[in-house]
Curated annotation (Swiss-Prot):
GO cellular component, one term: cytoplasm
EC number: 2.3.3.13
PANTHER family listed in its UniProt record: 2-ISOPROPYLMALATE SYNTHASE 1, CHLOROPLASTIC-RELATED (PTHR10277:SF9), HOMOCITRATE SYNTHASE-RELATED (PTHR10277)
Name assigned to this protein: 2-isopropylmalate synthase
Cofactors (names): Mn(2+)
Length: 515
């Protein structure tokens, strides 16, 4: 079996999804889980785009040991220098340099001739080679580029020191047969291609990102790039968990394997969904909640007799298990700490104290506390940002009557420590609550999206709310959890506002580039 390397770009390409704005702590938690998942390489960010991205890449580089940590850079010396500084503490640093090669990009974006593009690519790879042993070079918009020109520029950048060549389908334009032919052409045409690894990077605009990735592997690609849950700009990227499971399940047909630890799939997927606010659709392949459900009576009968009649993927393979009671209201601190070790989450003494207190409060309200409940508490604590003073929810009440307009009263602690209170009406309980919070905060806020989900099951399940707001022109996501739906909704809205102030203080302006 040939080994296919997995290049995860959830923290870079995935974070370019509209409204996704992970803080430094959230990015680090995702990076640590990606390492547990077994990704070979993770693209931690684009350090030249902002101070925040630089600091995040630097922290991840200093933390991750087994996976290679990669920084994105344009074909510009200053970007390469900044990437080098961000990755100084990495065990396995690498740089990813991209430059457009399609006629439309060279003419209208770069305003360079093909000869000038080759010269720039060679010069920047040569410059990067003085700082990095591992260099990935991407031909942006490769699938709309002239194939002969691609072969020419690839040969030159390999001579300059590139170690990985990436042929991205930047706009999700290609098809499996066509993409496979491109890889075969490059393998057969570029004389020094065997000196490097060949990588694919597919977007999902036509719904073929995973199929295109597998077609590339069949035709010489030794690395697949993508994201967890397939998140990303526009229609997203190739879902890495789908690629890995497809190769595993169809190992009878595909002589390839990855190094992913598939039983970590569910945990990884859930974490990314929770922190980005991009929930996994119920019928998503491999990891959707309906992936192992059977509605048809014929199907149910078959599965009961032999699961292999209709299930080609077992829940256990991807880490799906039933939630069970693990701790109760009489559980002590020692038992609680033992349970945390199973999650592999490290807490400071202060964080442990906070987590245990929240757990005890939850056991007063819930008869059964599940792994999902506890993991939600832990992630809320681990990913909290304390960069600036914030608004805090002190108290709220909502009055609802079918014969009257809902009314909400809210008391907040403002960033300066003073208590502020207001009452507003709305067409529903949530609207009344949000109108009151908005009135107290006194910013130009528009609610774009609101979601509420249960964590685990049962009538006393923990509620988790995700909101997306536009505040003074900035799109921000927020997340909140509580046993009460309205409390979770209020916490999510306030968290989104606080994130806006964190970003505003840090003055994080981001440059977004596709590859």
């Amino acid at each position: 079996m040939s080994r296919i390397k997995i290049f995860d770009t959830t923290l870079r390409d995935g974070e370019q999804s509209p409204g996704v704005n992970l803080n430094k702590a959230e990015k680090l938690e995702i990076a640590k889980q990606l390492e547990k998942y077994g990704v070979d390489r993770m693209e931690a960010g684009f350090p030249a785009s902002s101070k925040g991205d630089f600091e995040s890449v630097k922290q991840i580089a200093e933390t991750i040991k087994s996976s290679s940590v990669i920084a994105l850079a344009r074909a510009v010396k200053s970007d390469i220098d900044i990437a080098y500084e961000a990755l100084k503490g990495a065990e396995k640093p690498a740089i990813h340099i991209f430059l457009a090669t399609s006629p439309i990009h060279m003419t209208y974006k770069l305003k360079k001739s093909p000869e000038q593009v080759i010269e720039t690519a060679v010069n920047m790879v040569t410059y990067a080679k003085e700082r990095f042993d591992e260099i990935e070079w991407s031909a942006e918009d490769a699938t709309r580029s002239d194939w002969n020109f691609l072969a020419q520029i690839i040969e030159k950048v390999i001579e300059a020191g590139a170690t990985v060549i990436n042929l991205p389908d930047t706009v999700g334009y290609t098809t499996p047969e066509e993409y496979g032919k491109l890889f075969r052409f490059i393998k057969e045409t570029v004389p020094n291609i065997n000196q490097v690894a060949l990588s694919c990077h597919c977007h999902n605009d036509l719904g073929m990102a995973v199929a295109n990735s597998i077609a590339a592997v069949e035709n010489g690609a030794t690395q697949v790039e993508g994201t967890i849950n397939g998140i990303g700009e526009r229609a997203g990227n190739a879902a890495l968990e789908e690629v890995a499971v497809a190769l595993k399940i169809r190992s009878d047909y595909y002589p390839f394997e990855t190094g992913l630890i598939l039983k970590e799939t569910k945990r990884t997927s859930d974490l990314v969904a929770k922190l980005t606010g991009m929930y996994v659709q119920a019928n998503k392949a491999v990891i959707g909640r309906n992936a192992f459900s059977h509605e048809s009576g014929i199907h149910q009968d078959g599965v009961l007799k032999n699961t292999e009649t209709y299930e080609i993927i077992t829940p256990e393979m991807v880490g799906v298990s039933s939630n069970t009671l693990f701790l109760g209201k009489h559980s002590g601190r020692h038992a609680f700490k033992d349970k945390l070790k199973e999650f592999g989450v490290e807490l400071s003494e202060e964080e442990l104290k906070t987590a245990f207190e929240q757990f005890k409060l939850l056991t007063d309200q819930k008869k059964e506390v599940t792994d999902d409940d506890l993991y939600t508490i832990l992630m809320d604590i681990k990913t909290d940002s304390t960069v600036v003073d914030k608004y805090k929810l002190i108290q709220f009440g909502v009055s609802y009557d079918t014969a009257a307009t809902p009314k909400a009263n809210v008391i907040l602690e403002s960033p300066n420590g003073s208590l502020i209170e207001a009452t507003q009406q709305g067409n529903g309980s949530v609207e009344a609550l949000y109108k009151t919070i908005n009135y107290l905060i006194a910013e130009n806020i528009t609610l774009v999206d609101y979601q509420i989900n249960s964590v685990g099951g049962g009538k006393d399940a923990l509620a988790e709310s995700h909101v997306q707001i536009i505040i003074n022109g900035e799109t921000i996501n927020g997340r909140g959890s509580a046993q009460d739906v309205l409390q979770a909704s209020a916490v999510a809205f306030i968290q989104a506002v606080n994130r806006y102030y964190v970003q505003k203080k840090a003055n994080l302006t981001r440059l977004v580039y596709e590859s």
